[in-house]
Amino acid sequence: MSTDNKQSLPSITLAAIGVVYGDIGTSPLYTLRECLSGQFGFGVERDAVFGFLSLIFWLLIFVVSIKYLTFVMRADNAGEGGILTLMSLAGRNTSARTTSMLVIMGLIGGSFFYGEVVITPAISVMSAIEGLEIVAPQLDTWIVPLSIIVLTLLFMIQKHGTGMVGKLFAPIMLTWFLILAVLGLRSIIANPEVLHALNPVWAVRFFLEYKTVSFIALGAVVLSITGVEALYADMGHFGKFPIRLAWFTVVLPSLVLNYFGQGALLLKHPEAIKNPFFLLAPDWALIPLLILAALATVIASQAVISGVFSLTRQAVRLGYLSPMRIIHTSEMESGQIYIPFVNWLLYFAVVVVIVSFEHSSNLAAAYGIAVTGTMVLTSILSTTVARKNWHWNKYFVALILIAFLCVDIPLFSANLDKLLSGGWLPLSLGLIMFTIMTTWKSERFRLLRRMHEHGNSLEAMIASLEKSPPVRVPGTAVYMSRALSVIPFALLHNLKHNKVLHERVILLTLRTEDAPYVHNVRRVQIEQLSPTFWRVVASYGWRETPNVEEVFHRCGLEGLSCRMMETSFFMSHESLIVGKRPWYLRLRGKLYLLLQRNALRAPDQFEIPPNRVIELGTQVEI
């Protein structure tokens, strides 16, 4: 849903509730339970309950309301958000060295997201299914199988798209938040003393009383704000104002009421710590609440899956991941996509995590490191944008950065304590993704530079061919060209082996702009290089899919008539060999070869009919 959509504000706000707030909205299922479960050396004590509630409330205010909704969401690229967008914006007005550092930060943040998405569906669905322990304790052995069944169904429907099912997301999540509020308010009315925890003094007293342990306990408190990056990442779908409106009118009040309601329950009944969320409900409401919780966590998982599809497409289009098959599941909404490879790889990883960790409490130990790491990087990148792009006063920006890091760094440091008990998982997955992205980008650059160095000058070659033309054959030939100033290898090899040229030769370059969309007026640029040579440059945004047939249509409007089924497409297929390098660079080269062999072929990327494609091979040493 783009920001220029003509839907009414209430409908867009409702849709935002259904998609954006799924992850953070299901955090009450497990957050307070993990805070007070006894793992930090203290149980359900009054000061501890007040301290944790105060910390949760002020984190929701400072991190979500102030940092993300007020500050970070100001940084948009044509309305789009996300960590890679922030990386792109931050690097626009900086030196080459600074830009490289910012790119690394952005890629680390994106990699952290990949590490976290494996945990989110598992912990969300398992925490909901664990309500069975309250309803029927004898069914606790079914928690893992049922969680896998629910997620299997979710991943299976991805290829069909979520357009129809997605219409139910908003009313279900709105119902979820209203139930959160009602359950919490009911408990608060019975014990209003808990509202004293709104005073930040209780958070300060918590640190003073529990000292070192209180710092480590921040690793559990951060569970209340997991999913905060989704607010920024989904900005392009719904717009800033609907997301902010949904937070302040529905989501924030519901979360606060439920957390404080759980706290009020625990003050009266400390034994409810085994599952304070479900024990808020009366006995007759447990089964309906269990079903609603399962639906809410499935929706939260769907939002994460859609997010990883979007991030992958953006990384592919920006050249950080190898091309892969991307299927559009909706003719109306460009954001609804399905990536089979990513879908089933993620499913396999989630199932392995569920089977390995067995309980959401065990998974909570793995949750948080990647989230807080991304928060630190977002603070640095967003304040860089404020200074370099918005030209804010450097001292004011420095104060903002210090304020953000004073919260982010302690949260990240506290989560490092989880490293051995599960935190290694998202970090390991993130490291793998970072290695893959940097390998593809750097080795691809090395390959293109190598081909450019050994290529022939375009202008000189065309002048030579026009002066001493080879045999011409009827028709149009399109040569896919990566570099504007160099003759494509496929053209050189065609001349070398076939010794002919077509009557019309088009050098076609498809490039990705640093923007989500490119206006149709700027889509195609045509330049006639000689009586028989044309250069066509087609520009696309990173949210768009290149389509050669569309390019031909645009060319026809500009006076260069082309017919797909009467055109031959010549492409070079590089056979790569790794040259002499240090051992670690050889390993990176081998990884690149593996990625390239499994990458989507160019004809499939650009939707070119296979029977119109001629591939000419060339060997390149990298």
From Swiss-Prot:
Give the GO cellular component terms, alphabetically.
plasma membrane
**Per UniProt, which keywords does this protein have?**
Cell inner membrane, Cell membrane, Ion transport, Membrane, Potassium, Potassium transport, Symport, Transmembrane, Transmembrane helix, Transport
Coiled-coil annotation reads none
| GO molecular-function terms, A-Z | potassium ion transmembrane transporter activity; symporter activity
Q: What is the annotated localization of this protein?
A: Cell inner membrane
Recorded family membership = Belongs to the HAK/KUP transporter (TC 2.A.72) family.
What name goes with this protein? Low affinity potassium transport system protein Kup
Which species does this protein come from?
Salmonella gallinarum (strain 287/91 / NCTC 13346)
